[in-house]
């Protein structure tokens, strides 16, 4: 029986508290598109993406109108291109042509991003992997909707430090290649440890080889809803606090489950997972930082921040997992600086540093995300930050990632405008002491002792 109070509560969550479904992401396998001829390969991937994705945007809009739940993004992820392009691509320029084909497919289907210009090099790098990675700066400069990711480590395999070194250089080169646009290419490039196969969120989404031919994955959001719920229990003990977050996360996830099932049924594509992540936006009131401050912190970055974030992350999982038949992806709280007004404010007031953000990544969903750093930051320093994050992920058996933006021509204290959901960010201080000799050693960091489970 429909309860009018619950109907009103849902309406309030959507209209006043910024509840939305952040993304419907269609994952598409390109394993059957391989060809030794580059033109044929490009034709195969374009045809498959546009055939399966042609109704994604219109279906999302229909569900929005029918149920009144905003669906912010409709996106596509594909099999990591390094796995399928080896026969067709013989040079970096060939890979850039593939990126342009992906970009055209994204435009023609109407999605705002397409992820999967990716390589999985957690234990070693093939010549194809390296060619794709070295093509990333040119590919992101030549496209508007293509997103790239590289997985450089895992708990089972350790960390590929040769790839870590290379990715520091690639981030720098991408910043240079897109410097006319505030180095925006780096906002579409993520370096992972323990990357999941079914992540619906950009820029790190790709369609893993363990997945079906096509699946629908949905990413929910709702920081504003949880913040409003916590306002009603201000000053209560931790038991009440945890229960409130958990119950609210359940309601938010049910909305995502409904949208996922509807999209799956209407498109005739299997439902994959709901990602429980709390994804903020630059809008006032849609902030993960706001939740932490509502718990009692004077500012994000204050002592207690990591504990508050750990509590939030755990209760979101506990509430959300009951609300969906399949949960996956990243599933936790995102802490992107440029996309969260509360994080931006904390950086500006001096409360939040990169080092504190790194500590927070030990207990939350992803990692150092959308952080603007000085444009003259050395590649070896970027590699060192990537290695630190990868170590956290490897040792703790969790996904971690780095999306740093060394903004060419900007320095400490400047503010960079990225626009849209990417927001804006103050340029943050990076530790000035070097780590080049450490990064230049090369080779691999072995997997941790507790990874041997067999």
From Swiss-Prot:
Matches recorded under HAMAP family: UPF0210
Record's protein name: UPF0210 protein Memar_2269
Taxonomic superkingdom: Archaea
Positions of transmembrane segments: none
Family according to the record: Belongs to the UPF0210 family.
InterPro entries: UPF0210 (IPR007841)
Classification via Pfam families: DUF711 (PF05167)
Gene3D superfamilies reported in the protein's UniProt record: 3.20.70.20
């Amino acid at each position: 029986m429909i309860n009018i109070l619950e109907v009103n509560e849902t309406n309030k969550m959507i209209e006043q508290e910024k509840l939305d479904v952040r993304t419907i992401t269609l994952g598409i396998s390109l394993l059957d598109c391989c060809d030794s001829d580059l033109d044929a390969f490009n034709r195969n991937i374009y045809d498959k993406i546009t055939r399966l994705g042609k109704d994604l945007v219109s279906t999302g809009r229909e569900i929005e109108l029918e149920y009144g739940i905003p669906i912010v993004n409709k996106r596509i992820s594909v099999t990591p291109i390094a796995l399928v392009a080896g026969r067709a691509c013989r040079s970096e320029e060939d890979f850039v042509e593939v990126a342009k084909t992906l970009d055209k497919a994204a435009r023609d289907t109407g999605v705002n991003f397409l992820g999967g210009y990716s390589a999985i090099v957690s234990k070693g790098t093939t010549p194809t992997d390296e060619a794709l990675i070295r093509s990333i700066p040119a590919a992101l400069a030549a496209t508007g909707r293509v997103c790239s990711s590289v997985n450089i480590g895992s708990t089972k395999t350790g960390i590929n430090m040769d790839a870590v070194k290379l990715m520091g250089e690639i981030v720098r080169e991408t910043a240079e290649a897109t410097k006319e646009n505030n180095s925006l290419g780096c906002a579409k490039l993520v370096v992972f440890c323990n990357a999941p196969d079914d992540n619906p969120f950009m820029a790190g989404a790709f369609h893993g080889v363990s997945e079906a031919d096509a699946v629908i994955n949905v990413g929910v959001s709702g920081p504003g809803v949880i913040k409003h719920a916590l306002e009603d229990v201000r000053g209560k003990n931790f038991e009440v606090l945890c229960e409130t977050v958990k119950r609210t996360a359940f309601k938010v996830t049910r909305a995502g489950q409904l949208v996922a099932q509807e999209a799956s049924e209407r498109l005739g594509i299997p439902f994959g997972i709901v990602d429980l992540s709390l994804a903020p936006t630059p809008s006032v009131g849609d902030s993960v930082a706001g939740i932490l401050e509502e718990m009692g912190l004077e500012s994000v970055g204050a002592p207690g921040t990591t504990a508050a974030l750990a509590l939030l992350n755990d209760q979101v999982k506990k509430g959300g997992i009951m609300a969906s038949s399949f949960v996956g992806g990243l599933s936790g709280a995102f802490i992107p600086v440029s996309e969260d007004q509360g994080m931006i404010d904390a950086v500006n007031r001096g409360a939040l540093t990169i080092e504190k953000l790194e500590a927070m990544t030990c207990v939350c969903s992803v990692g150092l995300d959308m952080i603007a750093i000085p444009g003259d930051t050395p590649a070896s320093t970027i590699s060192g930050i990537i290695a630190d994050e990868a170590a956290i992920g490897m040792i703790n058996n969790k996904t971690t990632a780095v999306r740093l933006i060394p903004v060419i021509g900007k320095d400490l204290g400047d503010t960079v405008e990225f626009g849209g959901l990417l927001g804006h960010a103050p340029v943050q201080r990076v530790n000035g002491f070097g780590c080049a000799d450490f990064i230049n050693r090369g080779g691999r960091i072995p997997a941790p002792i507790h990874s041997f489970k067999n």
